[in-house]
């Protein structure tokens, strides 16, 4: 008699091996398993890390192979290989998989997709030369943990025809939205993502530092600035940047800019950021040559 507690999975046709059980790799494993993909293998830096990720799939289902990275040669065959390692390890993983492929005969070659935002499918060339379909899928979402919800996320996809089809299917099944870009544009695309996410965090940290110089503690400064940031994001949801811009540069307030520049003289990093972003803000507004000249002279 079957175990009544064991979760019954619908039949699936796609087996998946995930190499790199970090935050994104584990989040993908959990999300794909929830959509009835069969997680064949999980590879992490250590077997213990892989087992930890596997337990998040289904505590009652221990069928997934767990491997330490050093034992990649024992990896079982699968239809799809997702390489979710750091960027500087992807080429090595591709070479190892290609070497492993030499010892196996397949009627149908698998697909390999990596999840780097900056690298194209070209980094998987060793696999392409073995007849694999190769590509990349990258989620435009901050993955803060293994249970990060991927539903509704935008994903960039590039690669060969089969890889594009597989990538689009995965994104659709995960409740996301996909768009394709040229392989050579991956670095520019990823830089745009960094500008709108990571660099915003860095800029927010500079603003915190400035308020702390005013005598506020960091926690209070954060509480004060977060609603302002949230209101700006809300404006950008419905308006073009030129219409969403408010404040000193939108008004062309010359005297206030003078006061800001004077106050920032002792903070070189903040001063340089203020100058560069101020000039960009002026491009979104009516021309204010006096302010531009002031910023250029700093």
Predicted features by range, described:
Residues 2-73:
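NAD(P)+-binding Rossmann beta1-loop-alpha1 motif at the extreme N-terminus of oxidoreductases
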Residues 26, 30-34, 55, 95, ...:
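Short, well-ordered alpha-helices that flank and scaffold nucleotide-derived cofactor binding pockets
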Residues 47, 60-148:
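Rossmann-like NAD(P)(H) cofactor-binding subdomain of soluble oxidoreductases
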Residues 48-52, 120-123, 163-165, 291:
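Short, charged/polar "capping" segments at the starts of alpha-helices
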Residues 51-56, 60, 127-133, 148-238:
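Internal alpha-helical scaffold of NAD(P)-dependent oxidoreductase catalytic cores
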Residues 234-291:
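Interdomain hinge/lid region at the active-site interface
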């Amino acid at each position: 008699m079957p175990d009544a507690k064991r979760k019954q999975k619908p039949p699936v046709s796609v087996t998946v091996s995930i190499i790199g059980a970090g935050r994104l790799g584990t989040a993908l494993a959990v999300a794909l398993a929830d959509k009835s993909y069969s997680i064949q293998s999980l590879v992490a830096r250590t077997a213990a890390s892989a087992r930890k990720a596997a337990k998040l799939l289904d505590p009652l289902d221990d069928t997934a192979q767990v491997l330490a990275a050093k034992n990649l040669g024992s990896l079982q065959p699968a239809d799809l290989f997702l390489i979710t390692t750091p960027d500087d390890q992807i080429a090595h993983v591709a070479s190892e998989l290609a070497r492993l492929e030499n010892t196996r005969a397949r009627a149908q070659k698998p697909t390999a997709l990596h999840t780097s935002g900056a690298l194209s499918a070209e980094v998987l060339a060793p696999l392409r030369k073995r007849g694999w379909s190769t590509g990349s899928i990258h989620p435009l979402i901050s993955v803060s943990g293994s249970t990060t919800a991927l539903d509704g996320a935008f994903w960039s996809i590039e690669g060969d025809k089969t890889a594009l089809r597989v990538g689009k299917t995965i994104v659709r099944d995960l409740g996301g939205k996909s768009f394709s870009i040229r392989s050579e544009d991956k670095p520019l695309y990823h830089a745009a993502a960094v500008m709108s996410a990571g660099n915003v965090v860095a800029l927010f940290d500079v603003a915190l530092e400035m308020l702390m110089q005013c005598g506020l503690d960091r926690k209070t400064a954060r509480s004060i600035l977060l609603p302002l940031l949230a209101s700006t994001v809300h404006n950008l949801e419905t308006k073009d940047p030129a219409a969403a811009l408010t404040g000193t540069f939108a008004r062309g307030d010359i005297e206030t800019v003078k006061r800001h520049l004077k106050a920032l003289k002792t903070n070189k990093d903040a001063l340089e950021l203020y100058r560069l972003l101020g000039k960009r803000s002026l491009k979104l507004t009516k021309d204010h040559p006096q302010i531009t000249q002031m910023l250029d002279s700093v």
